């Protein structure tokens, strides 16, 4: 391997091992060939430089695919400072490649909670002082929250936030409702080319991959329980069914529950008659005692609670692909049960009490990624072709908000512009078209007569905002 050199004097980064940069660069080049929409935007806007002057704070999983996103943003004129939004999700070779390119990045796999917050702070601060950032790109809302709580003065310069995930969007909407959100935001998560690709098809690909890498288990013929049947749950249930698992689904939303039934999954509840009264007696121990694998997909809290964890079959695999580690009651497990590390991001959780444990005891659970995102903790996340749509949306959303120049508006006009909106459908269709071209697909064009008949233009948008894809 050749020696890795960062630009002369460049020290504005912290990664696990800068010598991994050559490996990371090789993977970045391969990823570029699998991200036609993102690379198409890079070519389309290279001359016009729509992000010239943009200074973007980024907090999203520091993967190879994110490296392609970062270099697309900089190719279109932006400066960026980057950290990961998850302590386990960084691919160290990706972070090294970005640092070697002279881009400030603070991320490594296996950060502590304190290191995670330190990394975010290092993106916010440059030479010990708040950077004059004017855009935010977030995943989960931690960066947004820190800016609002600790650095509110920085918000006066920021034009907008683009948010990647369901959890982050929920936090933005809560802030908007409470009147604490100070800048407008684009909900990237609910763009069709994000939610259907990343949340559904991405999880279909990466969930079983992560479980197999983490456990080396054969999944076929075993029983799985998927908690939640939104887009992430749908992809997860398909992922396990592909492996030959007997998949059951739990849901709180009657519409999603109906979809699970229509898709051929048995709809069950981990609670007797579907009612959780807070007691262990309400847990359906007979059901959970047969479950070999449980995965949470909701973005909600304690959807796999202490009572459920106690009732699960011995040696069951427990994992989360929703967002934060509080979907599973890991706090209860840390307090009451003994943890034995098998390898990084794989633990035996001995249910015989805290402290010491008998290594020959078979009453344990296998917890993956400490209850954090399993597909990024135990594997490499979604493939490049999936993240292509999500990250193309991020680029277009950054351009859209940067051009609106919210921070430059007079105070009396800012209030009406404080919104959390989905990316305009025309831009969603632009991303989809580039993705289709990447597959070698050909989209049929409407004739003028056909367009007039259904009340659209030949160029689109082709569906009303109320259309459910």
UniProtKB/Swiss-Prot annotation:
It is found in: Cytoplasm. Keywords: Cytoplasm, Hydrolase, NAD, One-carbon metabolism. GO terms for cellular component: cytosol. GO terms for molecular function: adenosylhomocysteinase activity. Binds 1 NAD(+) per subunit. May play a key role in the regulation of the intracellular concentration of adenosylhomocysteine. This is Adenosylhomocysteinase. The gene is ahcY.
